[in-house]
Amino acid sequence: MRQRLIYILKHNAAIQAIYRIVMSFVFRVMGLFIKTDDNLVLFVSFMGLNFNDSPKAIYDYMQAHPGYKGYRCMWAFEDPSKFPNLETVKIDTPAYFRTALKAKYWITNTNIERGLHFKKKGQKYLNTWHGIALKYIGNDVAGRNDFNFDTVDHLCVCGDYDERVYKSAFRAKESSYLRVGLPRNEELWNVTDEEKAEMRKRLGIPADKKVILYAPTWRESTDGGKSYEIKPPIHFDEWKKELGDEYVVLFRAHHQTTKVLGVQYDEFVREASSYPAVNDLMIAADILITDYSAIAFDYSILCRPIFCYAYDYDTYLAERGTYFQIDDKYPNKSCRTEEELLSRIKEIDYKTESMNTKRFRDEFIQYGIGATEACVKAEFGK
């Protein structure tokens, strides 16, 4: 039901406008009667779905440094019962909005105000966002005009490209740009061969196998927001015949995907969607296969081969849109068919493709090391 309501708000401009005006007014009035707690920090990751990403990196930093022990950290989740060791509140409930009005510090990778505008004077808002965008986001998506980050005090950017995108997509203020990169990606810089080997061991990968991480992005709902299914045109039995002697595949669906159709898991194709830390999977992987996901930019930090399997590119381009043509920028252009993808993997020149990935990384990512500490100091002033 919650997903359905969110879908309606996103896709019905009239209902969205009424909701935004009325509820923003209600919460602004409520805010007049709720005193700000200078030691309360509200965290939200992926709209309350997970305990991960850059907000978790910031939280972990605060827990590890004595100077931040005096802060009370509250996490908002869709299902707080999954996180018994954290202080939590259920997102999109009256208690959540009271907490948001009370907390002096907001930290998220999506949004805190839930499409509304009720931030009070003196509250500090850090939005890391959750990746560099290939596909249109925010107000750049057809039919959307509801993103307004003018209340965000600090917005993480990875480079000049992000700054251009966020200006149109979010109406972000240039003064809010925190030019530090993403805290979640900090551990991907300078990964050693020993760390890679240890991660593969933790994941149970045989020593004689290479790892392909396949991580497609989500697709828009076809049933009015009831579900977000994905059925990639993939025949993993053929992949096994062609690649099984040398590789294993880790299949990771986007967090917003509700169901993966047509995929049978075994020793060759392993389910990785439920694994909590995507960075672990990237560290272990020798090759990334994706499509329009921000994971391509994250993985590029490792300077390893990337393949773009854009089987529905023409349709996706028409329905969603992208900021640039994949074949103009991606390190290995794109593959439109399964046969082409398998052929390229079998013929890969690892060194050449790694160099191509580095050029791709350097075009889009200018900042990254020290991101977590920089975010904490910007938000808390110490």
Residue ranges of each PLM-predicted region?
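Catalytic binding pocket for nucleotide-activated donors in carbohydrate/polymer assembly enzymes
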Residues: 264-267, 294-363
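Conserved catalytic-core segment of nucleotide-activated headgroup transferases in glycan assembly
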Residues: 52-61, 183-263, 335-337
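Membrane-proximal basic amphipathic "stem/tether" segments
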Residues: 1-47
